[in-house]
Amino acid sequence: MARIVGVEIPNDKKVEIALTYIYGIGKTRAKQICEATNIDPNKRVRELGDEEISKIATFIQQNYKVEGELRTEVMQNIKRLIDIGCYRGLRHKLGLPVRGQKTKSNARTRKGPRPSRIKKKK
């Protein structure tokens, strides 16, 4: 398994798909990385040489925020919304949907499991 930006990339996958295992890189960005580094996206990871792997790794580090750096930025953005007390920040704080979805009957993922209603027997 190749290691790029601290993430183990599976050997049996194509480069384009394998790069999506890195947090912050989707299919479109993976294609852009392959084009910029002149690597065939349909090539398997095990077929890549050390030089090509290091080429991909340096390109990603220089041009994109990925993994821990991206996660901390997202957390800081959410914390900033909470600190300034805006509506979106309050929704994050309360653990409710942020983008205007209805919550009367849905939003179970965001709200968590239903509170149990166990009645006492007399």
UniProtKB/Swiss-Prot annotation:
GO molecular function: rRNA binding; structural constituent of ribosome; tRNA binding
Any Pfam family matching the protein: Ribosomal_S13
SUPFAM superfamilies: S13-like H2TH domain (SSF46946)
Top-rank taxon, per record: Bacteria
Entry keywords, A to Z: Ribonucleoprotein, Ribosomal protein, RNA-binding, rRNA-binding, tRNA-binding
Cited InterPro entries: Rbsml_uS13_C, Ribosomal_uS13, Ribosomal_uS13-like_H2TH, Ribosomal_uS13_bac-type, Ribosomal_uS13_CS
Record field: transmembrane: none
Cellular component GO terms held in the UniProt record: cytosol; small ribosomal subunit
S-adenosyl-L-methionine listed as a keyword: no
Bias (Basic residues) ranges: 101-122
Recorded family membership: Belongs to the universal ribosomal protein uS13 family.
NCBIfam families listed in its UniProt record: uS13_bact (TIGR03631)
Family matches, as HAMAP family: Ribosomal_uS13 (MF_01315)
Subunit field text: Part of the 30S ribosomal subunit. Forms a loose heterodimer with protein S19. Forms two bridges to the 50S subunit in the 70S ribosome.
Protein name per the record: Small ribosomal subunit protein uS13
Natural source organism: Thermosipho melanesiensis (strain DSM 12029 / CIP 104789 / BI429)
Gene: rpsM
